[in-house]
A protein has these predicted regions:
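Short glycine/serine-rich loop segments
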Residues: 122-160, 173
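Basic nucleic-acid-binding alpha-helical/helix-turn surface characteristic of O6-alkylguanine DNA
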Residues: 1-121, 168, 172-201
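Non-transmembrane, interaction-prone segments in cytosolic or luminal domains
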Residues: 86-87, 159-161
Length: 201
């Protein structure tokens, strides 16, 4: 486990022996909460999970992840310099996260649209459950998925953080918590983007 700090918040990152990111926490107020969250989101058991964060590759990859999040929170568009380990995810969850990774900055879509693109239009709730367990928040932008009526829906980090992340990306959110329709991606556009995007894992 690598723990980094952004301002007064902690981010915990779990890294496997192949230098891939297994899971990470959202920025949290305490180191313990961040570590517990990252561990709870890990889809696989790490045989060496108590290995020292001072191992050179853990330190290097952990710093890269924290720098990615830091750049993102500054409004920049950082590029992935590390790999994600999706080994423990179900095929459905992989499909959901892959589709969500193709949603461009400045846009949102809804749970129902994601369900249709992955091939099961009745699976909106299952999509929501998969996103609630997203091992790589912010990196795989589950905050860009909202309800069909364009209200924000849920978010593990709370709705205020979801609103903040969307605003960083230039998405207009009304005081009542609804995204403006100009930012919405239809099923058709989402399908095209997901087919043409480079896979994150």
């Amino acid at each position: 486990v690598y723990v980094g700090k952004i301002d007064d918040k902690y981010i915990a990152v779990l890294i496997d022996e192949k230098e891939r990111v297994v899971s990470l926490s959202l920025p949290r107020g305490s180191e313990g909460v961040a570590v517990d969250e990252a561990k709870s989101l890990a889809p696989i058991e790490l045989s060496f999970k108590f290995r020292s964060e001072m191992d050179p590759f853990i330190r290097r990859v952990g710093r890269e992840v924290v720098e990615f999040i830091m750049s993102y929170l500054k409004g920049e568009e950082p590029k992935l310099t590390f790999k994600l380990n999706s080994d423990g995810l179900s095929s459905f969850t992989r499909k959901v996260l892959s589709v969500v990774s193709s949603i461009p900055r400045g846009f949102v879509t809804c749970y129902g649209c994601v369900a249709k693109v992955v091939g099961n239009q009745k699976a909106s709730r299952a999509v929501g459950n998969a996103l609630a367990r997203n091992p790589w928040p912010i990196i795989i932008p589950c905050h860009r998925v909202v309800r069909g009526d364009l209200t924000l829906g849920g978010y593990r980090g709370g709705l205020e953080l979801k609103r903040k992340l969307l605003r960083i990306e230039g998405v207009a959110v009304t005081p009542t918590g609804r995204v403006l329709p100009a930012h919405f991606l239809s099923t058709e556009l989402l399908s095209e983007l997901s087919q043409g995007s480079r896979k994150a894992f």
